[in-house]
Structures are given as C-alpha cells and as structure tokens.
Curated annotation (Swiss-Prot):
Protein name per the record: Cobyric acid synthase
Gene this protein is translated from: cobQ
Function recorded in the entry: Catalyzes amidations at positions B, D, E, and G on adenosylcobyrinic A,C-diamide. NH(2) groups are provided by glutamine, and one molecule of ATP is hydrogenolyzed for each amidation.
Organism, scientific name: Streptomyces avermitilis (strain ATCC 31267 / DSM 46492 / JCM 5070 / NBRC 14893 / NCIMB 12804 / NRRL 8165 / MA-4680)
Domain annotation GATase cobBQ-type: ranges: 260-433
PROSITE patterns: GATASE_COBBQ
Catalytic site positions: C341, H425
Pathway assigned to this chain's UniProt record: Cofactor biosynthesis; adenosylcobalamin biosynthesis
Length: 502
C-alpha cells in the first residue's frame, strides 16, 4: 500500500503536530512502516539530521514517533523568521536566502510546489503510509493560490484531510464548519471529517454537538482526544512562551536532595531551540521558568540565555531591559550563567555581523573571551565530545564563528568561573553530562541539590510519544482512520456553501 493522510487544523496550535506524531506512533505499533511529512514549516525550533540538513524539530520528533531516522525529505521547506516580515528560507536542509513575506507568497512559494510533491512522492514510494501535517489553517483564503502545505498539496497528491480543532479555546464547532465552508468544492471533496482535541469533561455532553456537525457537513468526527498535560513536546515556535515575565514554569517533581534548583531562561527575541531546557525541566527538583526582568534573576540558581535567530537584537534587548547588567553582576559574584548558541555569542567580547543583522561591529557582554564573526555559510553538524568527564552529543545550527581566546575548554566554547558558553544545542539531553553540570551549578549556588541518578531524557521522550499513540488508539476511531489512510476520502461528500470566494 501507499497510504496517506493530511492533518489540517482550524488554527495554529490546534494540535496538528502532536496528532501527527500520535498517529505515527499508533501505526508503527501496528507494524506499519510510516513516515511524517510537512511540506513547509515556519519555526525557530529546528534540528540537524545525520546528513547535515536542517529541518523543523517537530518533524524530527514525529520521525522518532515513527521510529525512523529524520531526513530533509520530511520537511523540504523551513522558514525561520528574522522579523515580522521576513524569514530565512531553508530548502532541502540548506539556507538559500532571506525573503520577505510578500516576496515569498508573490511567487517563490508556488515555484516550490514541485519540490515538495517530489519529496512526498519519494516518501510514499518508500513507506506504507505518510502522515502529513498542514500549517495554520487550510482556510486562509488570501493565501490559497500559493498554498503548498495544506489543500494545495492535498489536491495534488489526492490526500484525504482530517481537520483538528482545539475545543479548549472554545468555538470549535464554528471553526470546524467555517473551515470547510470557506474551501472550494474541489478542496471540500478531500475533507473527510474532524478530530476534537483537548477536551475536558464528560464526552456525552459533547456528542449532540458532534451529531449536529455531521448533519450540517455530512462529515463524521473521528474522535475526541482528552486534554492531557505535558504533551506539548518540541513545539514549533514560541507561541506558548509569552515574553511578559515569568509565565512558563515546568511542573517540578520532588527533589532527591534537600533543595530544588531554580533555572531562569531569558526570553530573548526570536528564541530558537528553547527546547534545550526541556531536559533540565525533566529533572526531579529542577523548576524552569522564562523571564524578562532583572529582578527575576535574583533567586535563580542558573540563568540560561538560549539560542536566537537575532543575536544582535537579543543583545539590545538584554541591555534595554537591564538584564545585561544583572548578568554581569551574576558573573562577578560567581553565580552560574549558561549561554547556548546565540546565547553563547552574546556573552563574548564583540560580534562582527554583516550577515544576520548587518550591523557590523557590535560589543558583546564581555563575560567570555570570545570573538564572533558571522559567516554566510551556516554551520550544520552533529558533534560528539566530552565535558565534565561525561560523553556529550549535540547539534549545531549557526552562522556565527567563534574565536575562543581563553578560559577553560567547554565543548566547543569555554568556561570562565561560573559562566559557560557553547554552540551545542541538545547537549543537556546527554544524561550523564546534564547531571554533572547540575552538580556544578548546585555547588556554585550553595544548594543541597542532588540530580536523580535514573533520569533518562530519551526514556521520558519515548514515554511521551507512547502516550500520544495511546491517545489515538484509545480515543480515536482507529478502524475509520485506517480506512481513510488506506483508501482516501469517501466519495460523495457534500459541498458546504458558500465555498471559497471567487
């Protein structure tokens, strides 16, 4: 067989990524050889494949759910925003330039349709089933002409479409109906039904509404997934991380030692790969929060400056907010600070940037003996090394080239006192290294904190992916879902007026 399915959504963050991952995990547990696919992703959270290609981190997570190695075929187009109006375009894993939204939708996007269809065809020729994820909503009528990720690809590849709606936000029935009613007759023929996500309460109270929706649209609901905490793994962007103060705390479990460890993550502009701190949040006794005010660093045992798509912009933001001076005071007092990728670069002496911000010479915070020069060629690699006596694996995604002139070696970067810096994303996912690093932080902070010996980040990730598979298996109509994947959308689905505007 060469089955396929497109998971569309009524909105962004409706749950498309986790539903796609859940279906992949459910299928692979049934012995189906399955792969994920997203034609075009807009995200600052990315991943480096074994062949050195950059793809959306959500697709890497979905590949893990499918128990296959992620490749550039699974996300041929990645857009990495640099501002509200422009993005870096990554094609088949390599950056090909910056482009404005108007320029992209004005012609470039449409020209990429052949590329993404070729990638999808290659995957469908290799796997039993390909589960595709859409983007935003398929009913963005102003963008339909150049769409290559929702109905544009569904029409060309004849994929059945399942629309996911987040009922926790309210208005899910109007969203379901409106999504279908704004599609053309040809697009509507592929929309097979709906999947309710994040439901709280008694499903029997929802069922009359689902029956009414079926009567109105001629399309069934394929399941009601209950709301579950802790399943927003590898989010595509910072949608859930407001930049207004301490707004996102990890759910801390009981510490092994006497004290908890508090981690403050600076919520810098254009945060990228902030999933780096997920491994810290997974440790019992470690609480992680995102902050944007200097006073919020006062009780933090560790401050993390994460990656960013705008290093110079992040420096300006840190200075404007008074965080730069707070970081200098921390460093002088021997209190731990960790910079990762762009966060590492801001800790250096100066930056020469004629590529990203085109600001030329910019002074850094001066906390590490590092000089950074931005190169047009992006570094995309998966390094392996050792630090603090432990094996470490990571991945690098950056234009900045660091010249380290002093300090103690730390991965590819350095350490001076209690200030660490590295380009390596994902290093904290190495369990032994993470525990050794947290012991160093606890000692410097004077905390009686003991890392849990048995915490496996990879194991916890597998448990989360299994929970996603369980959600599909237990709360979706899997027989109907399998028929949809295998045979496509049923014929004779009714047209819901008014349809797409002329």
């Amino acid at each position: 067989m060469s089955g396929g399915l497109l998971i569309a959504g009524t909105t962004s963050d409706a749950g498309k990524s986790v539903v796609t991952a859940g279906i992949c995990r459910w299928l692979v547990r049934q012995g189906v050889k399955v792969a994920p696919f997203k034609a075009q992703n807009m995200s600052l959270n990315s991943f480096v494949t074994r062949e050195g290609a950059e793809i959306g981190r959500a697709q890497a997570m979905q590949a893990q759910a499918a128990r296959v190695e992620p490749t550039a075929l699974m996300n041929p187009v990645l857009l990495k925003p640099g501002s509200d109006r422009s993005s870096q375009v990554v094609l088949m894993g390599r950056p090909v330039g910056e482009m404005s939204a108007r320029g992209y939708h004005g012609g470039r996007q449409e020209a990429l349709l052949g590329t993404v269809l070729d990638c999808l065809a290659e995957l469908r020729g290799t796997y039993d089933a390909v589960i595709c994820e859409g983007a935003g909503s398929p009913a963005e009528i102003n963008l339909r002409r150049t769409d290559i990720v929702n109905m544009g690809i569904a029409r060309n590849a004849r994929l059945p479409v399942l629309v996911v709606g987040d009922i926790d936000r309210g208005g899910v029935f109007a969203s379901f109906f409106g999504t279908v009613a704004l599609l053309s007759r040809e697009d509507q023929e592929l929309v097979a039904g709906f999947l309710v996500n994040k439901f709280r309460g008694d499903v029997s109270l929802l069922e009359p509404g689902l029956d009414m929706l079926r009567n109105l649209t001629g399309r069934p609901s394929y399941g009601v997934l209950p709301f579950q905490h802790g399943l927003g793994i590898d989010e595509e962007d910072g949608l859930r991380v407001s930049l207004r103060g301490s707004v996102r705390e990890s759910a801390v479990s009981s510490p092994v030692g006497e004290d908890i460890l508090r981690v403050a993550v600076c919520a810098i502009p254009l945060m990228s790969n902030f999933t780096d701190v997920d491994a810290l949040a997974a440790e019992p006794g470690v609480v992680v929060r995102f902050v944007d005010r200097p006073e919020e660093l006062a009780d933090a045992d560790l401050v993390v400056i994460p990656g960013t798509r705008g290093t110079v912009k992040a420096l300006e933001w840190l200075r404007e907010r008074g965080l730069a001076e707070a970081l200098r005071r921390r460093a002088a007092a021997g209190r731990p600070v960790l910079g990762i990728c762009g966060g590492f670069q801001v800790l250096g002496e100066h930056i020469e940037d004629d590529v990203e911000s085109r600001r030329g010479h910019v002074e850094g915070l001066g906390l590490l003996p590092v000089r950074v020069r931005f190169a047009r060629e992006k570094t995309l690699t998966r390094p392996v090394g050792e630090a603090l006596g432990e094996h470490v694996e990571g991945y690098e995604i950056h234009h900045g080239v660091a010249d380290v002139t002093g300090g103690d070696p730390f991965l590819d970067g350095c350490r001076v006192g209690a200030v660490w810096g590295t380009h390596w994303h994902g290093s904290l996912e190495s369990d032994g290294f993470r525990r050794a690093f947290l012991r160093e932080v606890a000692a410097a902070a004077g905390r009686r904190f003991v890392p849990a010996a048995g915490t496996s980040f990879a194991g916890l990730r597998e448990e989360q992916l299994d929970r996603l598979g369980d959600l599909i298996e237990e709360h979706a109509d899997t027989d109907a879902l399998w028929r949809l994947i295998e045979s496509g959308a049923p014929s004779g689905l009714p047209f819901i007026p008014p349809g797409a505007p002329a």
